[in-house]
From Swiss-Prot:
It comes from Methylobacillus flagellatus (strain ATCC 51484 / DSM 6875 / VKM B-1610 / KT). Residues 462-465 are annotated as: G3. Residues 223-235, 251-263, 270-281 have a biased composition (Basic and acidic residues). Residues 441-445 are annotated as: G2. Keywords: Cytoplasm, GTP-binding, Initiation factor, Nucleotide-binding, Protein biosynthesis. Residues 416-423 are annotated as: G1. GO terms for cellular component: cytosol. This is Translation initiation factor IF-2.
């Protein structure tokens, strides 16, 4: 039907005629009366207008149903603890109603519009709704009711690919044929050729997509079937392997096919157990007939059900035939449980291996990297040392390669043997009196000074010469450009002189030798040169490359020549450093000041350190609150090669740590805390290893006496040197155990720790505060104060010697000749003797010698002279004596009388 009136078209659509006229006017079709004729052009214009008005992208007659299901699963983490994880599954389903405008429309006005029929054309199946109406009058079909019936009863709907993204489920609706047989509008008449072509292409795309999905589903099913067959064959092989060597006759009947299993589910024998099918509740006692059947339940009987159970309950997992070798990345510290997890073995296996290697460990014990690598290789895996995920790796990013390099003053370290005049030499250069202020006249700290000379600025580092300060001297050589080796002309080359040469050569630093004390009459500079040549330090006038300068720190002779030699050596090195960048440097020394907190001596090596900078030094960080030079004057900035004291760090840094300026306080705190944790883990692992080693040593050697010490000093380098020297005093019988070392005054916590651990408190250049002194009086803790390292080492050495068990020594006190032997019943043999020399005492120990051979060693039982018991008989007197429990005495025997005395031992 090509044309119809407005009233007829309104009745066909089920709309009021007035509403249709309004929509036509909105579409630009000028119709005013109900009898006006509508052409195909007018209907197309109306359709396009309605599409533009309501849009076709989001059809109104579409319902999206979402379903959310939350379940919980239990999963174990790397440490073996079970954790509950919530899993949320969301499903989305889209129900679409077909638009009545796309189907043949019934022209009867009074009849209700029935639900749309199942559409067979593929173009209409994939089509979206064309005419959604905003008014409730337009939709005569009760859509929500139809959807609820669809969800509740769920008849078999016809699936049509309406929207591939959402769920591709459409509502199937039935067609009710009406009695009126009026002409109908077809979809081809309502839709243009372009729209139909578009829908055909969409239908073809949907068909191709469904074909691809069907092919993928088929492949997945084939793969699953293939895996099931492989698992079945593996299960049969395992069952055959288990049945080998049994006494019963093997089951000859083949396993039933999968089709037969479903058919025999309800038989008497019952393919599956009605209760406890997997045998978890009861293991059951296997008889001889059950030996070849794996995985059966406890109700299974007979060979028929055995083979059936074997198929149904055989797990698909097959054990690997070869050992799996893992590549294990081992960090610096790792617990036993984590190491087992990385190797995919039980923690008990790792503990067993460690016990075989002589280590008693627990699952949470921390192992160091070296031990963990040995364990991994012992268990047949490949161990690799893991690169640490250190946040300080980002510190190298801020390299300032474009910074201008400027000349800087040389850093000169003065090294040499103790009492050879290092500090006195510096005193003359600085025109100060430092050596007289040092305890005992020896240097026990690194002193850093910068000196203005007529030839330029020089920074001096004065190091201790005592043997205990090896680590300090090594730090001084590391931070320096030139080493002045001070050798006394009257003393020559000594052990610490040789050690200083080794430190300088290890750091690849040039040496200038200062032969000191040439003003003494016994000075012999040539001997110094000869002794140093044997240690590869050859003077220039002997064809070498080392400058020798003869000086006197007392008279000042040769000091100018020494400075000239040092500056000449520095010019050869062409020392340069950038100045206008964030500073980097080295911690020379650190101490805890009671009023100012942690104080650190820092040598700036590059850049400029300013007040207010955020710095990181090892495990300490903080903002520079104040900077002081070596004279105690306040400075605002310090350039390269300038030593300064800084205040404001969170803790006392370790000497030798690198100092770096950071812009971000948060990053500085993060790196410092990371270093603290790493240091603590490594220290704990080493302590544990040391405890185990000492435990096995004690088991082998018996009880070892231990002297517990707590050391507090004024600076970090002092307690480092003191603890190293004291630990060297340990022997196999007595050991020094340093429980705690620290910087600062002795506090109450130190006293409490000493009281709990029965330790001796040593204060080196520090004293106890008021609260600690009261606690010391009440607890009776032994506290010793020292200013010189010699005295501390000597007293601890004496204390260790007192702890040694005394040595027993035999002391011969007399010799007795037996001249007559009397045999007395009830008494035994009594000897008449003559004391040749010495003295004989009652209850002394004697040694019986016959023909110069010791026959018996024992004690005197009685000693008499003229029938009287006496305590002792001196030489040239006669006496009678008897031996305890020994009667084989002959005339002519010699008795050697001796006493056992205890002699105190020393280290």
């Amino acid at each position: 039907m090509g044309q119809s009136s407005v009233a007829q078209f309104a009745s066909e659509l089920g709309l009021p005629a007035e509403l249709l006229l309004e929509q036509l006017r909105g579409a630009g079709v000028n119709k005013t009366a109900y009898d006006d004729v509508l052409t195909e052009q007018d209907k197309t214009s109306l359709l396009e207008y309605l599409r533009k008005e309501h849009g076709v992208q989001e059809p109104k007659n579409k319902i999206t149903l979402t379903r959310k299901q939350v379940t919980e699963i239990k999963k174990s983490d790397s440490s073996g603890k079970a954790r509950t994880i919530q899993v949320e599954v969301r499903k989305k389903r889209v129900l679409v109603r077909r638009d009545p405008a796309l189907e043949p429309v019934v022209a009867e006005e009074s009849a209700e519009i029935a639900p749309a029929a199942v559409i067979d054309e593929p173009t209409l199946q994939a089509a979206p709704v064309v005419l959604p109406e905003p008014e409730p009058v337009v939709e005569a079909v009760p859509e929500p009711v139809a959807v609820e019936q669809e969800l509740e009863s769920e008849p078999e709907p016809t699936v049509a690919p309406a929207e591939p993204e959402a769920g591709e489920v459409a509502v199937a609706v039935d067609e009710k044929p009406t009695a009126d047989a009026r002409p109908k509008l077809t979809a081809r008449e309502l839709l243009g050729a372009e729209e139909l072509a578009l829908r055909e292409r969409e239908a073809k795309r949907q068909a191709a997509l469904m074909a691809i999905q069907a092919e993928e589903l088929r492949k997945k099913q084939e793969l699953a079937q293939r895996r099931q067959e492989e698992a079945k064959r593996a299960a049969e092989a395992a069952a055959n392997k288990l049945s080998e060597g049994t006494l019963h006759k093997p089951v000859a009947k083949e396993a039933p096919k999968p089709e037969e299993k479903n058919a025999k589910k309800t038989g008497k024998s019952g393919g599956k157990d009605w209760n406890d099918s997997d045998g978890k509740k009861r293991g059951g006692v296997k008889g001889r007939s059950d030996a070849g059947v794996a995985g059966q339940g406890w109700r299974a009987k007979g060979s028929k059900s055995k083979s059936k159970n074997n198929e149904n309950q055989q797990h698909a997992f097959t054990a690997p035939t070869e050992p799996i070798v893992h590549d294990v990345l081992v960090p610096e510290t790792i617990t036993v449980g984590d190491l087992a997890h990385k190797m995919a073995v039980k923690a008990s296996e790792v503990i067993k291996t460690l016990m075989k290697m002589g280590m008693m460990v627990t699952i949470n014990q921390v192992l160091d990297q070296e031990t963990a690598i040995i364990i991994v290789e012992e268990m047949g895996h490949n161990a690799k040392a893991a690169a640490s995920n250190d946040p300080e790796a980002f510190l190298d990013e801020a390299e300032h390669a474009e910074a201008v390099q400027e000349p800087r003053p040389p850093v000169v370290t003065v090294m040499g043997h103790v009492d050879h005049g290092k500090t006195s030499l510096l005193d003359y250069i600085r025109r100060s009196r430092v050596a007289s202020g040092e305890a005992g006249g020896i240097t026990q700290h690194i002193g850093a000074y910068h000196v203005e000379t007529p030839r330029g600025m020089v920074t001096f580092l004065d190091t201790p010469g005592h043997e205990a300060f090896t680590a300090m001297r090594a730090r001084g050589a590391k931070a320096t450009d030139v080493v002045i080796l001070v050798v006394a002309a009257d003393d020559g080359v000594m052990p610490q002189t040789i050690e200083a040469v080794h430190h300088a050569k290890a750091a690849n630093v040039p040496i200038v030798v200062a032969v000191n004390k040439i003003d003494k009459p016994e000075a012999n500079p040539e001997r110094v040169k000869q002794e140093l040549v044997s240690h590869e330090v050859v003077p220039e006038d002997w064809g070498g490359d080392t400058m020798f300068v003869e000086v006197s720190a007392k008279t000042g002779a040769g000091i100018d020549n020494l400075l000239e030699a040092v500056l000449l050596q520095a010019e050869v090195l062409e020392l340069k450093a950038p100045k206008n960048i964030p500073a980097k440097g080295l911690v020379i020394e650190g101490r805890l000041d009671k009023g100012r907190g942690p104080v650190s001596t820092i040598l700036v090596q590059s850049g400029t350190l300013q007040r207010g900078d955020m710095i990181l030094a090892g495990t300490a960080y903080g903002r520079v609150r104040a900077m002081l030079d070596e004279s105690g004057r306040d400075v605002k900035e310090a350039g390269p090669s300038i030593p300064v004291e800084i205040l404001g760090l969170s803790d006392v840094p370790s000497a030798g740590e690198e100092v770096i300026v950071l812009n971000d306080e948060r990053k500085a705190r993060e790196i410092a805390l990371f270093r603290q944790g790493k240091f603590r883990d490594v220290k704990l692992a080493k302590q544990q290893a040391a405890k185990l080693e000492s435990m096995f040593e004690q088991m082998g050697e018996g009880e070892v006496k231990v002297l517990h010490l707590i050391i507090k000093s004024d600076v970090q380098g002092s307690y480092e040197a003191l603890s190293t020297s004291l630990q060297k005093l340990s022997t196999d019988e007595v050991k020094v155990n340093i429980i705690h070392t620290g910087v600062g005054a002795i506090s109450e916590s130190d006293v409490n720790l000493a009281a709990a651990s029965k330790a001796v408190l040593i204060g080196f250049n520090v004293r106890a505060d008021a609260g600690a002194r009261k606690l010391i009086e009440s607890t009776g803790v032994d506290v010793r104060y020292y200013n010189i390292i010699y005295e501390a080492v000597d007293e601890v050495k004496a204390a260790l010697g007192g702890m040694l068990s005394p040595e027993q020594k035999e002391n011969v006190i007399g010799t007795v000749e037996i001249r007559e032997v009397f045999r007395i019943s009830k008494v035994g043999s009594v000897a008449g003797c003559y004391v040749q020399d010495g003295v004989v005492r009652r209850n002394s120990k004697v040694r019986l010698i016959r023909d110069n051979v010791v026959i018996h060693t024992g004690e005197l039982d009685s000693l008499k002279r003229f029938k009287d018991d006496v305590k002792e008989v001196k030489s040239n007197f006669e006496c009678g004596l008897s031996l305890k429990n020994y009667n084989e005495i002959e005339v002519g025997d010699i008795l050697e009388v001796f006493e056992v005395v205890e002699v105190a031992r020393t280290l």
